[in-house]
Swiss-Prot record:
Name used for this protein in its record: Oligopeptide transport ATP-binding protein OppF
InterPro entries: AAA+_ATPase (IPR003593), ABC_transp_ATP-bind (IPR050319), ABC_transporter-like_ATP-bd (IPR003439), ABC_transporter-like_CS (IPR017871), Oligopep_ABC_C (IPR013563), P-loop_NTPase (IPR027417)
CDD domains assigned to the protein according to its UniProt record, in alphabetical order: ABC_NikE_OppD_transporters
GO cellular component: plasma membrane
Keywords attached to this entry: ATP-binding, Cell membrane, Membrane, Nucleotide-binding, Peptide transport, Protein transport, Translocase, Transport
Length: 319
């Protein structure tokens, strides 16, 4: 598979100002030197706790946040430059599904106009072609035709998210950034929305950057995974690399927090969580610099990278 988007040394800093003259005295390193590659038709998971910088990366990719430095390489060119972004029709090819579907939908517009908006922004087609396209999109996400004349408040959370998905795929994008797309939904509704996303990917060949804190969902949805902590990637690899052979103490910490429905192993799981948490506290100084930032990534295999101490002392899988 060929590359669709390549992030090179991406940095997003927010200045901290203080004093009478409101001078910049420090920076919040929301994203600090991230490298990430997304290939055509694949789903890359970006996971981490709140404040790790994962959503900032997603917003930077679609242009909702401004990067401090680095490169966004799309079709071999740096689309951080606005002129090149427009030439390559980047904003048409890269769309986003938001966490809060209701807030992302204009309450004054009908569903027809909401789905039609990106088509009208990027394509010049006649009314009949537009109408046909919108009805096709509605069928894809499983909503009835009468929904087109209704407004966002008339739908449930799951239906609103499906409307958001229909809007995202309206321009036939190459990549969709999905930022916590199901975190606000009930479990039964989550499954419906996730299955729609997988079906759309299979039918249309769209690549996804799937941003989430829920490792169970990420395991179900993704091919490759990057784990973020404090603005940096601490480990990345295939789904098997991350779930079966985790190497970084933070990755192990996240995995140990996944709830289990097996009540017979509840005591064992709790004991393991406490062990992993203690291991994290004991070894933290070896895996992070004095400012709390992860060390540079080391290549462990063709698909697996982790931010390990010098000498790779933690290359083991005792999770």
């Amino acid at each position: 598979m060929s590359e669709i988007l390549n992030l090179k040394d991406l940095k997003v800093y927010y200045p901290i100002r203080s004093g009478f003259f409101n001078r910049v005295t420090d920076n919040v390193l929301a994203v600090d030197g991230v490298d990430l590659t997304i290939h055509e038709g694949e789903t890359v998971g970006l996971v981490g706790e709140s404040g790790s910088g994962k959503s900032t990366i997603g917003k930077t990719i679609v242009g909702l946040e401004q990067m401090t430095s680095g490169q966004l390489i799309y079709k071999g060119q740096d689309v951080s430059k606005k002129k090149i972004r427009n030439q390559l029709k980047y904003n048409k090819d890269v769309q986003m599904i938001f966490q809060d579907a209701f807030s992302s939908l204009n309450p004054r517009k009908t569903i027809y106009d909401i789905i039609a908006e990106p088509i009208r922004n990027f394509e010049k087609i006649d009314a009949n072609t537009e109408n046909k396209r919108i009805h096709e999109l509605l069928d894809i996400v499983g909503l009835p035709k009468q929904a087109l004349e209704q407004y966002p408040f008339q739908f449930s959370g799951g239906q609103q998210q499906r409307i958001g998905i229909a809007r995202a795929v309206a321009t036939n994008p190459k990549l969709i950034v999905a930022d916590e797309p199901v975190s606000a939904l009930d479990l039964s509704v989550q499954a419906q929305v996730l299955n729609f996303m997988k079906l759309i990917q299979k039918d249309l060949g769209i690549a996804f950057l799937f941003i989430s804190h829920d490792l169970g969902v990420v395991r179900h949805m993704t091919d490759n995974i990057a784990v973020m902590h404090n603005g940096r990637i601490v480990e990345k690899g295939t789904r098997r690399d991350i779930f079966d052979e985790p190497q970084h103490i933070y990755t192990k910490r996240l995995l140990s927090a996944i709830p289990s429905i097996d009540v017979t192993r509840r005591a064992e799981n709790r004991k393991n969580r406490l062990k992993v948490e203690q291991d994290f506290e004991d070894k933290k100084a070896n895996f992070y610099d004095k400012d709390g930032h992860a060390l540079p990534l080391k290549k462990l295999s063709e698909s697996h990278w982790a931010a390990l101490p010098k000498g790779g002392e933690n290359v083991e899988s005792n999770y």
